[in-house]
From Swiss-Prot:
Gene: hslU
Species this protein is from: Bacillus anthracis (strain CDC 684 / NRRL 3495)
Gene Ontology molecular function: any one: peptidase activity
Function: ATPase subunit of a proteasome-like degradation complex; this subunit has chaperone activity. The binding of ATP and its subsequent hydrolysis by HslU are essential for unfolding of protein substrates subsequently hydrolyzed by HslV. HslU recognizes the N-terminal part of its protein substrates and unfolds these before they are guided to HslV for hydrolysis.
Major subcellular site: cytoplasm
Name the UniProt record assigns to this protein: ATP-dependent protease ATPase subunit HslU
UniProt entry tagged with the keyword Chaperone: yes
Length: 463
């Protein structure tokens, strides 16, 4: 966990991936720092301080989800994104709002488990290598020293059998030491071995997903799992692949699942972040009799955000200190259309701005995972070096901005569509092109995109 970052450091880290939106970055940076500050307080005061939930307002594609996701990744906090429209009011078929907390705990368990596996990796690999040695040089089947009732009475051949067994054991030990040396030197990586692995059983309760009955299914499945033996199957793999499988199995045996569960529940409760997208879609008090009440969903979300106990397969989880980040475009509604109680639970309001042409230029070239860098890396695998002139990048940004203005504004996601269309022919012919270096010019961009971009009827289907 990395809760020690200062707000300024958090913003600087987010700047590496997200362009603009300073207000949103500052809000999440302060929220994260307050968690660190809270952890330093005396226990009686710490229990009184709950995180200040954030409401992000802005059109699609401006970075609402990415800000929250990168923030969680930065500190290693459990994070999930849910869509408010997927939930239904209690009493209707569909996902109940408590499932978001259960999903958060599952994410937390996965994170903690991965960390624990890393800690025992060396020991697990050592045990996996030992199993490989035993597979490559198996012990001979011991034959009974008694052939008939008379031998049983007088033990006629017992000593000779013991001598033979002792010689065989010495021979096997020598062979195993030799194999151990070869394994350590990497000389047997391509040898094929047959190993028994635990079979992943498909759950008969998968059909319950999305019906609001997942918890019942999971508990029933766990109860059955403790009685039913695990199935194993034989697989033929190279030593290299078998080592990975066996190391994973040994690591699972070495980690203490009770410790994993305890730490995971603690992290979910104290450090968890739940991002509720499209909250504007459940705002508004009008509801048709045919539709599931949107206000009812808000009222179901309210106790989770306020703080309550949610039953999960890992035990009861308190939601009092989970940070909730809600987001919505609020085109057809406004934050005040949410029920007053829910509004009060999101005291920090942040408005994200629409992206300009200059923002698009920065998005294309500045972030560590910039789109142009991605395409350059992809085509480099075919032996082609592509570069974009500054004028070409500006032209791409202008076209993306214009198409957003003329059709639906989908923010930075428009750049993905534009870039795919721009490099479509080049990507298709890359394996056959003999040129080692290609420069994308404004003329090339104009040729590939301008005609489509100017025709609104065509651009709304293609771009």
């Amino acid at each position: 966990m990395h809760l020690h970052f200062t707000p300024r450091q958090i913003v600087e880290k987010l700047d590496q991936y997200i362009i603009g939106q300073k207000d949103a970055k500052k809000a999440v940076a302060v929220a994260l720092r307050n968690r660190y500050r809270r952890s330093k307080l005396a226990e009686n005061l710490r229990d009184e301080i709950a995180p200040k939930n954030i409401l992000m307002i802005g059109p699609t594609g401006v970075g609402k989800t990415e800000v929250a996701r990168r923030m969680a990744k930065l500190v290693g906090a459990p994070f999930i994104k849910v869509e408010a429209t997927k939930f239904t009011e209690v009493g209707y078929v569909g996902r109940d709002v408590e499932s978001m907390v259960r999903d958060l705990v599952e994410t937390s368990v996965r994170i903690v488990k991965e960390e624990m596996v890393v800690k025992v990796q060396d020991k697990a690999e050592e045990q996996a290598n030992q199993r490989l040695v035993e597979i490559l040089v198996p012990s001979p089947e011991k034959q009974s020293g008694f052939k008939n009732p008379l031998e049983m009475l007088f033990g006629g051949t017992q000593n000779s059998n013991q001598t033979t067994d002792s010689q065989e054991d010495v021979e096997i030990e020598k062979k195993r030491q030799d194999v151990e040396r070869k394994l350590a030197a990497g000389l047997l990586e391509d040898e094929i071995v047959s190993i028994e692995v635990t079979e992943q059983q498909s759950s008969m309760f998968d059909m319950l997903q999305g019906t609001g009955m997942e918890q019942m299914g999971m508990n029933f499945q766990d109860a059955l799992g403790s009685f039913m033996p695990k199935k194993t199957k034989k697989r033929k793999l190279s030593v290299k692949e078998a080592r990975k499988v066996l190391t994973n199995e040994e690591a699972q045996r070495l980690i203490d699942m009770d410790e994993v569960t305890q730490e995971a529940v603690y992290r979910a409760e104290q450090l968890g972040i739940i991002f509720i997208d499209e909250i504007d879609k459940i705002a508004g008090k009008q509801s048709n009799s045919v539709d599931v009440s949107r206000e009812g969903v808000q009222r179901d979300i309210l106790p989770i955000v306020e703080g309550s106990n949610v039953a999960t397969k890992y035990g009861s989880v308190k939601t009092d200190y989970i940070l909730f980040v809600a987001a919505g475009a609020f085109h057809m509604s406004k934050p005040s259309d949410l029920i007053p109680e829910l509004q009060g639970r999101f005291p920090i309001r942040v408005e994200l701005t629409k992206l300009s042409t200059d923002d698009f230029v920065k998005i294309l070239i500045e972030p560590d995972n910039a789109l142009i860098k991605q395409y350059m890396a992809l085509l480099a695998t075919e032996g082609i070096e592509i570069e974009f002139s500054d004028e070409a990048i500006r032209k791409i940004a202008e076209i993306a901005y214009q198409v957003n203005q003329d059709t639906d504004n989908i923010g930075a996601r428009r750049l993905h569509t534009i870039m795919e269309k721009l490099l479509e022919d080049l990507s298709f012919e890359a394996s056959e092109i003999t040129l080692e270096k290609i420069t994308i010019t404004p003329q090339y961009v104009e040729e590939k995109l301008a005609t489509i971009a100017k025709n609104k009827d065509v651009s709304q289907f293609i771009l």
